[in-house]
Amino acid sequence: MQGSKGIENPAFVPSSPGTPRRASASPSQVEVSAVASRNQNGGSQPRESEEPQKSTEPSPPSSNPPASDEPPGSQLSELEEGPCGWRGFHPQCLQRCNTPQGFLLHYCLLALTQGIVVNGLVNISISTIEKRYEMKSSLTGLISSSYDISFCVLSLFVSFFGERGHKPRWLAFASFMIGLGALVFSLPHFFSGRYELGSIFEDTCLTRNSTRCSSSTSLLSNYFYVFVLGQLLLGTGGTPLYTLGTAFIDDSVPTHKSSLYIGIGYSMSILGPAIGYVLGGQLLTMYIDIAMGQSSDLTEDDPRWLGAWWIGFLLAWLFAWSLIMPFSCFPKHLPGTAKIQAGKTSQTHQNNSTSFQHTDENFGKSIKDFPTAVKNLMRNTVFICLVLSTTSEALITTGFATFLPKFIENQFGLTSSFAATLGGAVLIPGAALGQILGGVLVSKFKMKCKNTMKFALCTSGVALVLSFVFIYAKCENEPFAGVSESYNGTGEMGNLTAPCNANCNCLRSYYYPLCGSDGIQYFSPCFAGCLNSVSNRKPKVYYNCSCIERKITSTAESTDFEAKAGKCRTRCSNLPIFLGIFFITVIFTFMAGTPITVSILRCVNHRHRSLALGVQFMLLRLLGTIPGPIIFGVIIDSTCVLWDVNECGIKGACWIYDNIKMAHMLVAISVTCKVITIFFNGLAIVLYKPPPPGTEVSFQSQNVIVSTISVEEDLDKAENEG
């Protein structure tokens, strides 16, 4: 193989601007045969025209002047396979990882790390960051959105230029940026000094002067910009992961296995938040300044307690950077990619509006080609329908991921921590199981593009029917003093203050629910008029409460205390049924995720796959994940019956919701989004027109068929014919 002399690892030879039309002897070869018109018999004539060329060119490249004029590396610009390693260093032990399974393992580890940081550690640390750096919720909300903003801005450009580039190296860059973003996000802890404890707040009824309104701001809030920078860096790293990484997996495995591999990879990104929540929750039980110790009388139940939120980000930084070297050692294409591509058939959607394709092999290397490529994608009606269906699904999934714990907490009277645990136990395993099942079924039955869309339509239909579980799981509001119940007839409905607590000067900004022995729930011990408490009991108990009517009974329990910390035990028993049905709903919802991704990869031109994923994720965030929590928040706020109002008269968070109205509103938005999803899925099925049978997929355009074959097969045929 004289033509490859001097190239020890073709994967690391830079491609030249000019791509040769022929490559006579290279580790992998691309032959282009122009077809004047599409053959009605499945394209047999173009194959016959290739045979004489193959048989007459087994000679060294020196006999082919056009090819020899180009640099050796340019012969491999389209498809470069090579060993695993760095330049001239290719240890044999690394070659075991030079497989689709080896790449998938590292892809899963990076997706897991990204999920742990972005959707796990960041979310669970937001409330702690608010308190530590004295930020408003609007600022922390912008911190959370910064990741999606970065992803939207970069996704199109990264996916467009990365499609023709070295995708594993792009993922090495992604590992670096994810690690750097996690490191930057933790930096405020090291530069803001030691956390200073404030004075403890007495939650019982005390006669004192009313608190004064203070609108001063703290310099600590300036660390907001550091947190935003960290999120922007994390978004920069996440962009290649879900666009170029997915396309690389699709390149490296047969069509029927692609959905399985993609489903496994996506399931890891879903399991990441679960690990992030568990890890972050455990770290929050450690005091924030672990190196300086803590006061012996400070416990987690104290409102002044802050946990060590920053440790998880340092661990993620180290783990993400440990993946840089493994990704950098992969070749541009895994061994065997040429044969896999040669065996694939095209499923690209065909119609008049998308018939324009590019026969220039250099297309996609210049920024001037970017608008044309995007325009060509936007003309693909099937692609647009599939993307719109995913945006509708993303809207409700992100909305429920954000507010499902709040729904469970209010409907079933649970604590915030336990409600969050139950919500995570339903959402995360259900989503991961759905992704894997969807990929397994599509792979097992070797579904074509249209069948995968039909499969997604069916699963969405089942999820639509199951969405009505919110109506049957609704629970009546428990009696609440000042909201749904009066203070023994002495107070007014809708007013927490009554004659029994008028002298306590209670704060509505301090919500600490209390269950009285009369079965009525109170906003706080102060609003219940409680004067004394016993803190060494679990839960904390209160007595001498002027607003609680003491029942005269002979039971010891009634004389033990008048109220205990926490919400009253709900009389609603629908929680197990709700969790079971909602778990099944989540499975069917996410079963459509992998088939839709596979359909998008199949219905667009082969060279536009990464860009198609970039467009999908950009629109998915602009129309789904960014507005989703906002829309859900507005809808849930519309069901509020008691708002937090501070000393300055500024409305804050909602304390009490109308459970029945909340259930109905969530059903309405779920059904609406599911109907939109089903509509666009069905429209994509109707509009889809597959290419004629036998059309090859390997770097093909509509009027050009590019057959990818290995040089070993070329030489074998030449010897047989000679």
Curated annotation (Swiss-Prot):
Organism of this sequence: Mus musculus
Transmembrane segments: 102-122, 142-162, 169-193, 219-249, 270-290, 307-331, 377-398, 419-442, 447-470, 579-601, 611-636, 671-688
Region entry Disordered, spans: 1-81
One of the GO biological process terms: spermatogenesis
The keyword Cell membrane belongs to this UniProt entry's keyword annotation: yes
Gene: Slco4c1
Localization: Basolateral cell membrane
The protein's role, per its UniProt record: Mediates the transport of organic anions such as steroids (estrone 3-sulfate, chenodeoxycholate, glycocholate) and thyroid hormones (3,3',5-triiodo-L-thyronine (T3), L-thyroxine (T4)), in the kidney. Capable of transporting cAMP and pharmacological substances such as digoxin, ouabain and methotrexate. Transport is independent of sodium, chloride ion, and ATP. Transport activity is stimulated by an acidic extracellular environment due to increased substrate affinity to the transporter. The driving force for this transport activity is currently not known.
Compositional bias (Polar residues): 25-46
Domain Kazal-like: 494-549
Protein family membership: Belongs to the organo anion transporter (TC 2.A.60) family.
Tissue: Strongly expressed in initial segment of epididymis and seminal vesicles.
InterPro entries hit by this protein: Kazal_dom, Kazal_dom_sf, MFS_dom, MFS_trans_sf, OATP
Upregulation: Dramatically down-regulated 1 day after gonadectomy.
Keyword Transmembrane helix annotated: yes
Listed name of the protein: Solute carrier organic anion transporter family member 4C1
